[in-house]
Amino acid sequence: MIIRTTEDIGNLVKITRKNLKLTQVQLAQLSNVGTRFLSDLENGKSTCEIEKVLKIMLNLGLKLEVNND
């Protein structure tokens, strides 16, 4: 999947979380972030902190790869 916007990241996180049958509360606790932060992330809010986003992605088994194409 190509990520171009914060909405793309949010959608990927939400879809993956649901596929893993995790609630927002469970994933937030696992990632040591607040549920409000996770909700904002899943809704594409552009002011999210990248470190927290990466923690959440790691706990979902996702990785971020950057290419210079």
Predicted regions and their residues:
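A detector for short, charged/polar N-terminal pre-domain segments
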Residues: 1-8
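A generic secondary-structure micro-motif detector
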Residues: 3, 14, 42-43
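Short basic helix-loop element that most often maps to the first helix and adjoining turn
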Residues: 11-26, 30
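Residue-level recognition of specific faces of alpha-helices
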Residues: 12, 26, 37-40, 53
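Recognition helix of helix-turn-helix/homeodomain-like DNA-binding domains
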Residues: 32-46
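Short, conserved catalytic or interaction motifs in soluble domains
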Residues: 43, 68-69
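DNA major-groove recognition helix of helix-turn-helix/homeodomain DNA-binding modules
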Residues: 51-66
